[in-house]
Regions:
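N-terminal polybasic/positive-inside topogenic patches
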Residues: 7, 17-21
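Asp-based, Mg2+/Mn2+-dependent phosphohydrolase catalytic module
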Residues: 20-34, 43, 99, 103-120, ...
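Active-site neighborhood of HAD-like aspartate-dependent phosphohydrolases
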Residues: 24-83
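Conserved protein kinase catalytic core
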Residues: 48-50, 93, 167, 202
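Intrinsically disordered, low-complexity segments enriched in serine/threonine/proline/glycine
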Residues: 10-11, 15, 165
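Extreme N-terminal basic, low-complexity initiation segments
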Residues: 1-11
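Active-site loop/turn elements of alpha/beta-hydrolase fold enzymes
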Residues: 52, 87-88, 182
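Substrate-recognition element of Asp-dependent hydrolases with the DxDx(T/V) motif
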Residues: 68, 72-108, 118-131, 169
Length: 212
């Protein structure tokens, strides 16, 4: 586990050169006393502008999507935890280091914090396909966040741009989803579908009850 801007970030233990073997996406043995709903956000194509078929390998290539800061701030102001759940296979492929990924997230968090829109938890699967238990559409990252933050999944939402994001929510028992349309042809139904992240704030105000 690493700390980025005061936020615990889950990552592959082997890449941190720690001796004891653990299952990726480590679980805590305790839960906070209160239960709070969350908004789970995919990263590329939702929080930041999509890199297309490639990867965001450097912090200077990471650009927040128009409208996303306002949407994230609204979620926090209305009583939701903010959790980032992202697949970053570029680390597993050796295209970037874990340190580079951490730097991207640290800079992202610093920018978001200036607007009261920072994430409460960041969960990144950096493994190659077929080599772990946390790669989407597995619900593992959501379950880890639930245990770490005491989340009420039955009152939570997920925002993503790919079928694997929506299916991840279904597999975790997160009942409400918002799809951001992309070049991926949708095959899994979402609760709401938007053309871009710029429409997200309006959708939240019209459809999402305050959690306080």
């Amino acid at each position: 586990m690493a700390m980025i801007g005061g936020i615990e970030v889950r990552m592959r233990r082997e890449e941190m050169s720690l001796p004891e073997p653990v299952v990726c996406c480590h679980h805590r043995n305790h839960m906070p006393a209160t239960s709070q709903p969350a908004f789970f956000f995919d990263r590329d194509g939702v929080v930041n502008v999509s890199p297309g078929e490639g990867y965001v390998l450097h912090a200077e290539d990471f650009h927040l999507s128009p409208g996303i800061v306002e949407a994230l701030a609204w979620c926090r102001e209305n009583g939701y935890k903010l959790i980032l759940v992202t697949s970053q296979q570029g680390v597993g492929k050796g295209l970037m280091t874990q340190a580079a990924l951490d730097d991207i997230h640290a800079r992202m968090q610093a920018t978001l914090a200036q607007n009261g829109a920072q994430f409460d938890g960041i969960y990144a699967c950096t493994h190659l396909k077929g080599t772990c238990e946390c790669r989407k559409p597995s619900p593992q990252m959501i379950f880890d966040a639930q245990r770490d933050h005491g989340l009420d999944l039955a009152r939570s939402w997920l925002v993503g741009d790919h079928d694997r994001d929506i299916q991840m929510a279904v597999n975790a028992g997160v009942p409400r989803t918002i799809r951001i349309l992309s070049h991926h042809e949708p095959a899994v139904a979402a609760t709401h579908t938007l053309a871009s992240p710029a429409e997200l704030l309006r959708c939240l105000k019209e459809n999402c009850p305050a959690a306080r």
